[in-house]
A protein has these predicted regions:
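Solvent-exposed beta-strand/loop surfaces, strongest in extracytoplasmic domains of secreted
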Residues: 644-896, 900-952
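An often Trp-containing, charged/polar helix-loop segment at the C-terminal end
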Residues: 427, 481, 559-621
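Polar, glycine-rich mid-to-C-terminal structural blocks
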Residues: 414, 418-462
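Boundary/junction segments of secreted and surface-exposed precursor proteins
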Residues: 22-56, 644-649, 745-757
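Bacterial N-terminal signal peptides
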Residues: 10-19, 893-901
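Acidic glycine-/aspartate-rich tracts in secreted/extracellular proteins
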Residues: 79-80, 151-152, 255-258, 423-426, ...
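Substrate-binding/charge-relay-adjacent region of secreted/lumenal peptidase catalytic domains
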Residues: 29-140, 146-147, 151-421, 456-543, ...
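A recurrent domain-boundary module in secreted/ectodomain proteins
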Residues: 619-648
Length: 952
């Protein structure tokens, strides 16, 4: 253990005492969860605390021991009782008849009821300091502690090593194995952030164009503030003095802001001077560069866009730019310090990429709602497939989805207003004047809108994000015409113009020229109106991160009009949509979709084509309720009453089907079991069963916590069965899913058995036991099944017995006879370290094998020591194989190693080559999808089984 001077220990004691004295009275109701000393001898792992991006990256080896991690955050979780009390408070704060209506909390008041105790906070701070870390900040809301330290200190305290990794040409720092914490902290720590420097990407699309921004000759139009005022009916508010005066909008950033560009934008737009305030937390992120974790040019454009347009829609509002090395660090501090009543964050990612930190951030967003803060976020720019998009390793736009339907967080949080995107669609009507007027506007009136969808092979996936959350249940206020009966949080809530092509937003932003070795500032923009100083081009942006700060500006006008904080805006938005004012407040978008082209056989895309959601009457999963009329929104905001259900304790639901594979028309029985998430008790209420999102039968009352339903009306195909528990006066809602296969009663078909199961590897480097899969032909189906394997695990080596591997396609072939069965046993090998003598660092060896695109595969089950220069070169040869190389049989690798003397201790270590370490397979639980496809005449038949790989 590191020794400390008496001065250090004295300072620590004073810090702990200060925290205690400051909060003693208000924290009296919070119990201690840490009993006794925090010992490192007994530890528990924190699952889902490895970045999926790190798992896809090339490992360059351990980072230097003194590598500094400037902002690590240990997040705490509430007890079930605290969560129930907070849920109740949030409901009461939105009910006009409640004594808690709009009684917003301070951070200290939040901590007093929902944070950890001062004793526990001080104990954790003390333990961190003993490990050598420096405390950055202790959450005012009792939700987290931030600290800084080195890679060596992280390894000592959390049992995980920080590595240097490379992804898409960028170098990053990341942990590649799950961190662990002392058992004494297990009940209160939910996640650790800051062990990697993968930064969230902005949701903007930038194009620089040279035509005039309004041209009767070219027909090109771009949005200036004056156009926005006309299209979304902001002008009547501004003319009556509702312009944002007295309201602060906090904009989240992760790059230095150029204040001169903000000033020139306001001049070009005819807006009064209004200099933003900058608040920095932690290390200054600086300007764009190619250094690890540094800002990008996209961050610059995002910062300028958000500040300029939030301040354009609410021209007299105070704009606070909250800056740090990561936008979610900025968000954390904006909430914990209660910096502003309205928060705009234009950064996000698909839900599954957050791992366990999604729960920590959602709890933080609950704190924001309790404090009366309104948070708005983009719904994403990859259509209904948010886990796809961006660019591939070659820098080309990704235009085909492979990861299935997904939504963006934080927009998917029930405590955030998610903003989608539309395209202005004039048709044959002339909605534009030939010359610009006030605030550079030329739009004549509201312009009809369709779903934003610019997806193409050139643009890549480029459409309004939206869909169904896999992380959050449907909040009680999310109801109304068009809202799906999916029992999940649906996204988005509203939408505004977002297409950069028709018609994009004008901004002023530094024009950066990028090259292979450097990024050079080519000069400021907007030197001649909105034109850049160099080529005279216009900087035009789009994406849902353009609609987001604009909607934040509208909400600032609403807040000034109502004279009160809004808190979570969604309950009122949905109340307005369900009242008599829908057509006054919203512009319903009924044309278009956010569907994404998808690869046949990939997740959620068994037959190819596209997946996504279309627009419709009322609410839809592409644009929410549509765009808004700002004037009517502000004037009618207080005209509705929000009614909510009471808060309950968390519940858990499980569902099973019997049989899991049957013939169409046969009876299948669904059984749901509901229990408290913790403690004892017997939930009452009902369970609604659904098949592929459609209700089957009426809700079934629980009997001793169990509901049973039988049906013979399930259609043929792979189906998802959902059981949704309604909740009761004590327990909240919950849901669960199960997979079944129903084969045709008359047409050629086949089934897979089992449809679920678990493969377990005792440790990284071990193989799973063979898991037999049986394929059964019906109605004369015969031919060859094509098998594929997909998983999110970073290093794995699947193989099938009785099936022939096709190296060119990364698939397996399995013959099946008419009305017969075929069996193939799946084995998954995992990767562990192979030590190379002659190197000062233990190294890990991974050989690309049966690689699916973008996934590294390891040579599982190898053990031993490679010694001598020749053996090291052989290992280097294997590591150098391209990651996307077709399959190399493991026998070739074994043969080469044997020829060079693969054994423990053979050869000598003189001149041994150092290998780039490889992380091997991460521990944890990972989904594995096995898909089987066969053609029957002109029909392609596909079935899948959903398995789980557990690496212990």
């Amino acid at each position: 253990m590191r020794k400390h001077s008496s001065i250090t220990l004295l300072c620590l004691a004073l810090l702990a005492g200060f925290v205690f004295l400051q909060a003693k009275a208000s924290f009296a109701t919070v119990g201690n969860r840490i009993v006794g000393a925090i010992a490192t001898s007994s530890r528990v792992p924190l699952r889902a605390n490895v970045s999926p991006l790190a798992m896809q990256a090339k490992d360059l080896g351990p980072a230097a021991a003194n590598t500094r991690l400037p902002w690590i955050t240990l997040s705490f979780q509430m007890t079930p009782a605290q969560q129930s009390a907070l849920s109740q408070l949030l409901l009461e704060q939105q009910e006009p008849g409640s004594p808690m209506y709009h009684q917003w909390l301070t951070p200290e008041q939040f901590a007093a009821q929902f944070g950890v105790s001062p004793h526990d906070s001080a104990a954790v701070a003390s333990w961190l300091t003993q490990q050598g870390f420096t405390i950055n900040a202790i959450s005012r809301g009792g939700q987290w502690i931030s600290f800084a330290g080195t890679a060596a200190q992280v390894r000592q305290a959390f049992g995980t090593e920080i590595h240097t990794v490379q992804l898409n040409g960028e170098t990053h720092l990341a942990n590649l194995t799950a961190p662990s914490i002392p058992s004494a902290l297990a009940s209160m720590v939910s996640s650790i952030q800051g062990l990697h420097d993968f930064r969230p990407r902005p949701r903007n699309i930038v194009r620089r164009v040279s035509p005039e921004y309004t041209s009767s000759t070219s027909g090109n139009h771009y949005l200036a503030p004056g156009d926005f005022y006309t299209i979304y009916d902001v002008n009547p508010l501004l003319s009556s003095g509702i312009n944002g005066t007295g309201i602060t909008i906090a904009v989240m950033g992760q790059v230095d802001l150029n204040l001169s560009d903000v000033a020139t934008f306001r001049t070009a737009s005819g807006l009064p001077a209004n200099v933003p305030t900058v608040k920095l937390y932690g290390t200054d992120p600086g300007a764009p560069s190619f250094k690890a974790g540094a800002p990008t040019t996209g961050d610059v454009d995002e910062a300028q866009l958000d500040v300029e347009w939030a301040g354009a829609v609410a021209p007299n509002a105070s704009i606070l730019f909250v800056n740090s090395t990561a936008a979610f660090t900025s968000l954390t501090n904006a909430i914990d310090n209660n910096l502003a009543p309205i928060i705009s964050i234009s950064y996000g990612d698909c839900e599954t990429n957050f791992g366990s930190s999604i729960n920590s951030y959602n709890q933080l967003l609950e704190q924001a709602a309790a404090q009366g803060q309104t948070v708005v976020a983009p719904s994403g720019d990859s259509g209904a497939t948010d886990c796809d998009g961006g660019t591939n390793a070659q820098g080309s736009p990704i235009a085909t989805a492979t990861n299935g339907l997904a939504v963006d967080f934080p927009a998917s949080s029930p405590y955030v207003t998610g903003v989608g995107g539309t395209t202005l669609t004039e048709g044959s009507v002339n909605y534009w004047n030939t010359a610009n007027g006030a605030n550079s506007g030329s739009a004549k009136s509201y312009i009809p809108e369709t779903v934003w969808d610019d997806t193409s092979s050139t643009n890549g996936l480029s459409a309004s994000g939206g869909g169904v959350s896999v992380a959050f249940a449907k909040p009680t206020w999310q109801t109304g015409t068009g809202v799906p009966n999916d029992y999940s949080r649906d996204v988005p809530d509203v939408a505004l113009a977002a297409s950069p092509n028709h018609d994009g937003y004008l901004i002023c932003s530094e024009n950066y020229n990028t090259g292979p070795l450097s990024i050079v500032d080519a000069g400021p923009s907007c030197q001649n109106g909105y034109r850049t100083s160099g080529s005279g081009a216009l900087t035009v942006v789009g994406g849902t991160s353009a609609s987001t700060p604009s909607f934040a500006g509208i909400l600032a006008l609403v807040m000034q009009k109502t004279g009160a904080k809004l808190g979570n805006a969604d309950p009122v938005i949905y109340a307005l949509a369900n009242g008599n004012h829908y057509n006054n407040v919203f512009h319903d978008v009924t044309v278009g979709s956010n569907s994404s082209p998808c690869t046949m056989g990939s997740i959620g895309c068994p037959s190819g084509g596209s997946i996504g959601y279309g627009a419709g009457i009322g609410y839809d999963l592409a644009t929410g309720w549509g765009s808004v009329d700002a004037f009517n929104l502000a004037n009618l905001w207080t005209s509705v009453s929000v009614t909510n259900l009471g808060a309950q304790l968390p519940s858990t639901t499980t569902v099973t089907a019997s049989p899991v594979s049957s013939t169409q028309g046969a009876t299948i029985t669904f059984t749901a079991a509901v229990a408290p998430a913790s403690g004892t008790g017997t939930p009452t209420g009902t369970v609604q069963f659904l098949v592929n999102g459609s209700e089957v039968g009426a809700p079934v009352p629980l009997s001793n916590g169990t509901a049973v339903f039988a049906t013979s009306s399930v259609p043929a195909g792979d189906q998802t069965v959902t059981a949704f528990y309604s909740g009761d006066s004590t327990y909240g809602t919950s849901k669960a899913d199960a997979s079944i296969t129903v084969i045709s009663a008359t047409n050629p078909d086949f089934s897979i058995s089992p449809l679920s199961g678990t493969l377990t590897a005792a440790s990284p480097g071990q193989s799973t036991a063979a898991f037999p899969l049986t394929f059964t032909s019906t109605n004369g189906l015969a031919g060859t099944l094509t098998l594929t394997v997909n998983s999110s695990v970073n290093e794995y080596n699947p193989s099938f017995s009785n099936a022939t591997f096709n190296a060119a396609a990364n698939t397996w072939s399995l013959p099946i006879a008419a009305n017969g069965t075929a069996t193939a046993a799946l084995t998954i090998g995992t990767v562990h370290p192979l030590i190379v003598q002659g190197s000062s660092t233990s190294s890990r060896l991974a050989v690309p094998d049966r690689g699916l695109p973008g996934k590294r595969r390891g040579l599982g089950g190898l053990g031993g020591t490679i010694a001598g220069g020749g053996m090291a070169l052989a290992a280097l040869w294997m590591i150098a194989l391209p990651r996307r190389r077709r399959l190399w049989t493991p026998l070739l690798a074994f043969a080469l190693l044997a020829a060079l003397g693969f054994s423990a201790g053979c050869g000598n270590n003189a001149g041994g080559a150092r290998l780039a370490p490889n992380p091997g397979t991460s521990t944890g639980s990972f989904p594995v999808v096995v898909t089987a496809t066969i053609s029957s005449g002109s029909t392609t038949i596909t079935h899948s089984t959903n398995l789980t790989l557990v690496v212990q």
